[in-house]
Amino acid sequence: MDICLEKIKIEQTWKEFLKDEFLKPYFLEIKTHYINALNEGKTIYPPANLIFNAFNLAPLQDLKIILLGQDPYHNPHQAMGLSFSVPMGVKIPPSLLNIYKELQNDLNIPMAKHGDLSKWAKQGVLLLNSILSVEANKPASHAHFGWQKFTDAVISKLSDEKEGLVFLLWGNYAKNKKVLINPQKHFILEAAHPSPLARNAFLGCKHFSKSNEILLKLGKSPIDWNLNL
């Protein structure tokens, strides 16, 4: 079972940037695990057409910020291929509520009534989970597929070939990716995870204003973090 690049539904600039990764043996292993799970009748999130949504909404040439997550939401209708994000009409998860609280504290932006972060992605925020699929109701169930090899390669390649990117690392899992990033070329902002389990240590990090300050110093347009419709 070979990898056919034409069949990988990912935005063209990213496909070109990552084509060597798609052709490596580990990516074939990911594909094999994924297809086997489908053939076993497993329900997998996000839907197949949204697995690479983070890349499809944030073209490479527009990239400014990378916001790392862990794995997709595992409940029905939540996962949409963007870290922390849920579709319109879906209840806002606790971690995202804390993100909205920090936005309000940091930039005085009223809390959004929905959880769709697509607007951020379209402005150049790569909302990247480390693991890109999950079985329904089984958190981290696809951790053994090998997705981390792919997303680690994405981070390393961005670090090596780009400059002036802002990496937002929230929680220990994301902070462990720091070793993949060249701090001489990029900006790394670390904070506790926004989950309530972190006892609200995330609040007060001011990463939204800090990111925009960095972008302005680089001569780039800031992110409009306001998600209110």
UniProtKB/Swiss-Prot annotation:
GO terms for biological process: base-excision repair, AP site formation via deaminated base removal. The active site is at 71 (proton acceptor). One of its GO terms (cellular component) is cytoplasm. Keywords: Cytoplasm, DNA damage, DNA repair, Hydrolase. It is found in: Cytoplasm. Pfam families: UDG. SUPFAM superfamilies: Uracil-DNA glycosylase-like. It catalyses: Hydrolyzes single-stranded DNA or mismatched double-stranded DNA and polynucleotides, releasing free uracil. Coiled coil: none annotated. InterPro entries: UDG_fam1 (IPR002043), Ura-DNA_Glyclase_AS (IPR018085), Uracil-DNA_glycosylase-like (IPR005122), Uracil-DNA_glycosylase-like_sf (IPR036895). The keyword DNA repair applies. Its EC number is 3.2.2.27. It is an enzyme of class 3 (hydrolase). One of its GO terms (molecular function) is uracil DNA N-glycosylase activity. Excises uracil residues from the DNA which can arise as a result of misincorporation of dUMP residues by DNA polymerase or due to deamination of cytosine. PANTHER family: URACIL-DNA GLYCOSYLASE. Belongs to the uracil-DNA glycosylase (UDG) superfamily. UNG family. This is Uracil-DNA glycosylase. It comes from Campylobacter lari (strain RM2100 / D67 / ATCC BAA-1060). The gene is ung.
